[in-house]
Swiss-Prot record:
This is T-complex protein 1 subunit eta. GO terms for biological process: protein folding. Residues 539-553 have a biased composition (Low complexity). Its EC number is 3.6.1.-. PROSITE patterns: TCP1_1, TCP1_2, TCP1_3. The gene is CCT7. It is found in: Cytoplasm. Component of the chaperonin-containing T-complex (TRiC), a molecular chaperone complex that assists the folding of actin, tubulin and other proteins upon ATP hydrolysis. It catalyses: ATP + H2O = ADP + phosphate + H(+).
C-alpha cells in the first residue's frame, strides 16, 4: 500500500533547488551587471531611464540606475542592495561593486556546474578578500594631516577622480575645489545634512557658487512683502511652527448669534488673537521671522510697518538647517519667545539669482554650514550634477576621516590580482583554483575601463600584467592616450576605504548568492473584494477579508 503523500506547501508554490537554480541566480546577477557595465569610468556612457509616471532621469551613477530599475528577481535584488549600501557608506564605487560581485559569480560558475560544494567557494572567497584588504592597507599611501596644503591637494585630487566619470567631468577642477571648500567649512563631525544643494535654472555651470551659510529660495509671499527690508546686520531670528493668518472656519462649524454685536465680537476676537501673536513676536526683538506654516497678508503688512522680514511655508529641512546653524529652537507657540530660543547670524540678505530670489544667512555662530547653489540648463542635467556632487562630497568626507589613498584607473585591482595569483600558487588543492578565479575576476575593472573607452582591452591588460610583474604597482589604464600610465603620478587617486568597502561588499554578496540552495516563491493569494453597498450603510454586510496563506518550507 502506497503511503499518503504529505502536502506541505500550498498549491501553486514555485520551488526550485539544486545546481540549476544556483546557476539561474548567477545568470540573473549577470543581467544586472550588464545594465550598468557601460557606465564605468571617465569614458562611460549615460543611461536615460523613464519611470512609470513618465519622469526622465539621465545618470551614470550605478546606485541611481539600479534604484530606478524595478528589479523583481530575488537574487538580483542583492546586487541592487550592495550598490545602495556602497552609495550610503562611501558615496562612490557603486558601479565597481556591482561589476565585481557579478564577475566573482561568473568566474565560479563552472565550478558550481561541476558540483563543487558552495562552502568551499565561500571559504576561498573570504580568505582572498581578507588578503586583498590587508594588501590595500599595506600599500596605501598615507597623507599627513598636519600639512594643510598637502591635505587640501589630496582632497581635491580625490574629488576630481570621483567627478571624472560624471556628466560634469569638463568642469571637475572647478567643482572639486568647491566640494573641498564646502566640506572644509563644516565642523569635525562633517555632517552631510549641513551642506545644502539648491538648483537654479539658467546660467552656465561655472556660475554655480558656494555660500558660507544657509540659503533657500524665497517662499510665496503676500502683498506688503515689497515694503520689508531685505538686509539686516546681526538680526535675531524667530523660528516658528505657527500659523499667522486669518482662516475660514473648519467644515461644519456653526456659531449661533442673536445680534449683529455678537457677530462683531466674534470677528474682533479673531483679529485680537492674531494681533496678540504678532505683538509678542515684535516685542521679542526678532527682526527675521521664519515659519513652517503660512504667514498671511495681515501679518506680512504688520511686519513691514515695523521693519521686520517674514517668510512663511519655509520647507522643514531648510528651517532645521537654519536652527542648527543660527541657534535657537523652533517654537510651536509665541508665548515664550525669549532670547534663548531666538537664532542669530552676522548678516541676513535677500539676493536675486537667475530668475529666483534667495534668502541668505551668513556668519552663523552655532554650527558651521554651507550651501552650494547650482546653475545650469535642463532639469535632468542639474539633477545629475547634484548626484555627482553628492558622490564627490562623500569621497572627500571619507578621505578626511581615513587619510590613506590608492591609485585608481584599475591600478589597485591589477596589483591585487597579481598578489592573489602569486599567493594561489603557494597553496594546494581546490583553494588554489578558486583564489585564482577571484584574482582573475578583479581584472574586470581595468578591462571594462578599456572597453568603455573603445581600446583594445586584451593588449592593455597584457601590458599591465607585465608592468605589475616588474613592480610597477600603481600602473593602470590611461584613458587619454590609449596606453598604461603610473596613475599615482597622474593624480588619479581614491580613498583606500572606497576600494576596501567595494571588495568586502562584492565578496559578501557573491558568498550570499552562492550559499542559497533553494528558492521558494509563495503564490499570490487572491482576496475576494467585498460586495458593493447600496447607499450609506444600507448595503449587505461586507465579508471579512481572508488572511493571506503562508507556505512553510
Amino acid at each position: 500500500m502506497m503511503p499518503t503523500p504529505v502536502i506541505l506547501l500550498k498549491e501553486g508554490t514555485d520551488t526550485s533547488q539544486g545546481i540549476p537554480q544556483l546557476v539561474s541566480n548567477i545568470n540573473a546577477c549577470q543581467v544586472i551587471a550588464e545594465a550598468v557595465r557601460t557606465t564605468l569610468g571617465p569614458r562611460g556612457m549615460d543611461k536615460l531611464i523613464v519611470d512609470d509616471r513618465g519622469k526622465a532621469t539621465i545618470s551614470n551613477d550605478g546606485a541611481t540606475i539600479l534604484k530606478l530599475l524595478d528589479v523583481v528577481h530575488p537574487a538580483a535584488k542583492t546586487l541592487v542592495d550592495i550598490a545602495k549600501s556602497q552609495d550610503a557608506e562611501v558615496g562612490d564605487g557603486t558601479t565597481s561593486v556591482t561589476l565585481l560581485a557579478a564577475e566573482f559569480l561568473k568566474q565560479v560558475k563552472p565550478y558550481v556546474e561541476e558540483g563543487l560544494h558552495p562552502q568551499i567557494i565561500i571559504r576561498a572567497f573570504r580568505t582572498a578578500t581578507q588578503l586583498a584588504v590587508n594588501k590595500i592597507k599595506d600599500i596605501a599611501v598615507s597623507v599627513k594631516k598636519e600639512d594643510k596644503d598637502e591635505q587640501r591637494s589630496l582632497l581635491e585630487k580625490c574629488a576630481a577622480t570621483a567627478l571624472s566619470s560624471k556628466l560634469i567631468s569638463q568642469s571637475k577642477e572647478f567643482f572639486s575645489k568647491m566640494v573641498v571648500d564646502a566640506v572644509m567649512m563644516l565642523d569635525d563631525l562633517l555632517q552631510l545634512k549641513m551642506i545644502g544643494i539648491k538648483k537654479v535654472q539658467g546660467g552656465a555651470l561655472e556660475d554655480s557658487q558656494l555660500v558660507a551659510g544657509v540659503a533657500f529660495k524665497k517662499t510665496f509671499s503676500y502683498a506688503g512683502f515689497e515694503m520689508q527690508p531685505k538686509k539686516y546686520q546681526s538680526p535675531k531670528i524667530a523660528l516658528l511652527n505657527v500659523e499667522l493668518e486669518l482662516k475660514a472656519e473648519k467644515d461644519n462649524a456653526e456659531v449661533r448669534v442673536n445680534t449683529v454685536e455678537d457677530y462683531q465680537a466674534i470677528v474682533d476676537a479673531e483679529w485680537n488673537i492674531l494681533y496678540d501673536k504678532l505683538d509678542k513676536i515684535h516685542k521679542s526683538g526678532a527682526k527675521v521671522v521664519l515659519s513652517k506654516l503660512p504667514i498671511g497678508d495681515v501679518a506680512t503688512q504688520y511686519f513691514a510697518d515695523r521693519d521686520m522680514f517674514c517668510a512663511g511655508r519655509v520647507p522643514e529641512e531648510d528651517l532645521k538647517r537654519t536652527m542648527m546653524a543660527c541657534g535657537g529652537s523652533i517654537q510651536t507657540s509665541v508665548n515664550a519667545l525669549s532670547d534663548d530660543v531666538l537664532g542669530r547670524c552676522e548678516l541676513f540678505e535677500e539676493i536675486q539669482i537667475g530668475g529666483d530670489r534667495y534668502n541668505f544667512f551668513t556668519g552663523c555662530p552655532k554650527a558651521k554650514t554651507c550651501t552650494i547653489i547650482l546653475r545650469g540648463g535642463a532639469e535632468q542635467f542639474m539633477e545629475e550634477t547634484e548626484r555627482s556632487l553628492h558622490d564627490a562630497i562623500m569621497i572627500v568626507r571619507r578621505a578626511i576621516k581615513n587619510d590613506s589613498v590608492v591609485a585608481g584607473g584599475g591600478a589597485i585591482e591589477m596589483e591585487l590580482s597579481k598578489y592573489l595569483r602569486d599567493y594561489s600558487r603557494t597553496i594546494p588543492g581546490k583553494q588554489q583554483l578558486l583564489i585564482g578565479a577571484y584574482a582573475k575576476a578583479l581584472e574586470i575593472i581595468p578591462r571594462q575601463l578599456c572597453d568603455n573607452a573603445g581600446f583594445d582591452a586584451t593588449n592593455i591588460l597584457n601590458k599591465l600584467r607585465a608592468k605589475h610583474a616588474q613592480g610597477g604597482m600603481w600602473y593602470g589604464v590611461d584613458v587619454n592616450n590609449e596606453d598604461i600610465a603610473d596613475n599615482f603620478e597622474a593624480c588619479v587617486w581614491e580613498p583606500a576605504i572606497v576600494r576596501i568597502n567595494a571588495l568586502t561588499a562584492a565578496s559578501e554578496a557573491a558568498c550570499l548568492i552562492v550559499s542559497v540552495d533553494e528558492t521558494i516563491k509563495n503564490p499570490r493569494s487572491t482576496v475576494d473584494a467585498p460586495p458593493g453597498g447600496r447607499g450609506r450603510g444600507r448595503g449587505q454586510t461586507p465579508q471579512p477579508l481572508r488572511p493571506r496563506s503562508v507556505a512553510l518550507s
